[in-house]
């Protein structure tokens, strides 16, 4: 496999131009395309060697952690919604990073099986993402109209429906991340 690193680097720089666009525009642009050939494979290596944060498994690469830290500092979300709690390590890590950056927020982390511990500023919610009912299961969106929101889709289930549903509640300045740890 011959990887063109200069192409990957240039593609990454160009990708910043369309950073703040609607989900529909992003879907149209990326339909059946790999925008940055080779890069996802290169930077995802090591994700499953399990970095730990405190005693919790953290399914993130060092690169992910740097990007998230920068994003959290820039966006400063008042509410973080995470679909796919896993072990809960990601939510704990984000809560600690936000505190270290000097701002308060609350994290709502949803999974079909919620982690079995409590942590300041995090609410773990047992939730089957196949039964999207925003009004019943995600009341925080109704009450978050004047707050900056960061949504992270990392559940890998019913992704299209989740994105379409969540998109109705997002506004300019909010952020949506789709990841696959």
What are these regions (language model features)?
Residues 1-151, 155-181:
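A short alpha-helical cap/connector motif
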């Amino acid at each position: 496999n011959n990887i063109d690193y200069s192409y990957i680097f240039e593609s990454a720089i160009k990708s910043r131009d369309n950073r703040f666009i609607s989900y529909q525009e992003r879907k149209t642009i990326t339909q059946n395309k790999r925008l940055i050939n080779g890069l996802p494979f290169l930077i995802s290596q090591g994700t499953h060697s399990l970095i730990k944060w405190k005693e919790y498994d953290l399914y993130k690469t060092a690169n992910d952690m740097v990007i998230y830290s920068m994003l959290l500092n820039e966006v400063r979300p008042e509410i973080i919604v995470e679909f796919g709690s896993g072990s809960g390590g990601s939510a704990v890590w984000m809560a600690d990073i936000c505190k270290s950056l000097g701002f308060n927020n609350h994290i709502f982390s949803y999974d079909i099986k919620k982690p079995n511990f409590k942590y300041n500023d995090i609410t773990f919610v047992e939730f089957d993402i196949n039964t999207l009912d925003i009004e019943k299961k995600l009341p925080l969106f109704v009450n978050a109209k004047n707050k900056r929101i960061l949504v992270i889709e990392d559940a890998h289930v019913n992704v299209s429906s989740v994105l379409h549903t969540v998109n109705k509640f997002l506004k300019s300045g909010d952020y949506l991340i789709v990841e696959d740890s």
